[in-house]
Every structure is written in structure tokens, then in C-alpha cells.
Amino acid sequence: MKQILIISGKGGTGKTVLTSSLAALAKAAVLADCDVDAADLHLLLHPVVKGTQEFWSGQKAVIDDGQCINCGRCLSLCRFEAIKALKNQDGSLKKIEIDPIACEGCRVCYYTCPVGAIQMEDRLSGLLFISETKYGPMVHAKLGIAEENSGKLVALVKQKAQEIAQAEGKRWLIIDGPPGIGCPVIASLSGVDLVLVVTEPTLSGIYDMERVIDLAAHFGVLTKVFINKCDINWDNTRTIEEICQKRGIEVIGYL
């Protein structure tokens, strides 16, 4: 089994469209959408969900109103403004509450509460889906609102896709990666055989292409480039070709 990762240094270059096109052309392939923060491969491939798995990651603080003495210590220590003081009409303190979206799970309030009224609870951060498309099995996921640890969810998506590919004897694992060069992209890069960078002939497209090429080179992954929307600026297209030539990277296609 060979793993091909399609990524771009920025969003909107057309990597998901290219991924879906490769899926239509490939035979004996498993598909994985690792852009878990904003997954959209399903919009093109219309998968039928066969199984769902919860993704639990990290913890968030929860206040036990029965134990809380409203001392306000946690309120003054929270650097993320996740703890709020609710007041009565006369201005007196009614209760302390924690905004679950703003909470970063840093545990400062948990460790400093004088009466132990704050507990850390595991949080459901997202969902993983195992689906079937007319082009083959597909693994994709959805991260919850304001949730983090998308790198861990990316790793889980890849793991499930690899298991399916090995169990069914598939030849290819085609991965639609996230944009940028952050943790989710690094998680996507792990163990792949080829990185296909989709870029566009714009100044931001060129700059971000170079950043993601540098990232792939750091991990020693073979890299190719595909230029999408190549005719919107031929001067920039030639600039991309020159950059790739200097780096010894093949431009394998234009659209």
C-alpha cells in the first residue's frame, strides 16, 4: 500500500477537488479526509456513513454549585476569561460559572479552589466516520466547535484508513490533508510515501507553497507540485516552475 498526501500551504487552492479527481481515477483505493477542522471531501464524494466513533480529547473544568462558596478566587486567576460571575439584581454575587467553549483546560482553577468545588471532566471533541463511496471506503471526521487537538484526530483518521486499506488489500491510500503547516499537517505527513502540493499562481500561493515544501523536506518526504488555476497569471506560473526547478521538485500537472 502506498500513501499519497495532497496538501497546500493555504486554503482555497483546490486540493480537495484534485483529491476527489484522483479518487475517481484510482482503483483499489481508500480515501481519508484529514482536514478535520473544516472537512469538505464528503461534499464531493457523497459518502454513506457505515460507522461512527466518538473522539474524546482533553478535559474542561466544571463547577459543583453545591460546593462552591463563591469566593471568586478562580475568577481572578483565569487567564482565558472562561469563568464568569453572575450577579443578582441588587449587584450581589449569585454564582460562578465556567464557559465550556472558552475553557482551555489549564487546571489553574482546579488546583486553587479552596473547597475542591471544581472538577476536570473529559470532553467529547469530535466524531470520526467510516463511510463508503462509489470510489471506495472513506474515513473522515468532524471536530467540535472551539475544540482543539485536531492533530490527534488526524492521526486517528489515518490509522483507521490504514487499517481498512490493509484489511481489504487496497493498493492506495489517498489523503486529503489540511491547509497550512501546523500540527494537523505534520500529523498528516507521518508515514506517507508522496506529498503532492497543490498551489496557485498568486503571491500568497507561491509563498505558502514554499513553506509547505520546506516542511515536507524537513521530514524527508518525496514531494511533487501541481499548479491549479495556472492561467490566471502566467508570470507567477513560470515563477513556480523556476522555484521547483531550483529545488529539484517535479511539476506533474496543470489545470
Give names to the regions the model predicted:
Residues 1-10, 28, 32, 43-50:
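Extreme N-terminal, non-catalytic leader segments
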Residues 1-26, 66:
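Walker A (P-loop) phosphate-binding motif
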Residues 28-42, 121-127:
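Short beta-strand-centered segment that lines the nucleotide-binding/catalytic pocket of NTP-utilizing
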Residues 90, 115, 120-130, 152-254:
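Conserved catalytic-core segment of NTP-binding enzymes
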Residues 142-151, 203:
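Flexible beta-alpha connector loops of hexameric P-loop NTPases
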Residues 39-58, 130-131:
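P-loop NTPase switch/communication element
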Residues 73-98, 108-124:
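Iron-sulfur cluster-binding cysteine motifs and their immediate structural context
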